[in-house]
Amino acid sequence: SSAASDVYKRQVKEETKVEGMLIKGVAKDTDVAVLTVKDVPDVPGMSFKIFSLLAQKNINVDIILQTTGRDGKKDMSFTVPLGDAESAVAALKNATHRIGGGDITVDKTCAKVSIVGAGMQSHSGVASTMFEALFNQNINIKMISTSEIKISVIIDEADADKAVAAIHDAFIN
């Protein structure tokens, strides 16, 4: 990769430190695409078929969202690095006969914004504070992922800087 692209990646993954709080920082990542496979058969093994296919292509998957099954079908959305989006779509389209499913959509105008800290799942109100900060800026959340050390949301890339500032302010004040 070029020096310019390395600088770019450092910039988009910059972190804002939040001192003296449970939250250690706010991170932004714009190297994200959201893929959705519509109307996947709601039967055992479909997640394995989809994600093993991507693993064979060395495509890293981060956040996964699966809708509740209806009429024997469900939608599966997940994030991949922007540079892998097209090869992921191609791999999935080539395997439609194996995985079933309908249309495959890709959204390349997303960003992942995360708050990072320790023991977040055992402290009530952390996610709520983050979501309120986004709501107050009229920022729509497309996907959410939580763990013990991180809460991440997928939002429109155009809102990423505003989101980082709003979340930072919510936890500082």
Labelled PLM ranges:
Residues 9-173:
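A conserved regulatory-domain signal marking ACT and ACT-like small-molecule sensing domains
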Residues 1-8:
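Short, small-residue-biased leader/transition segments that mark boundaries at the very start
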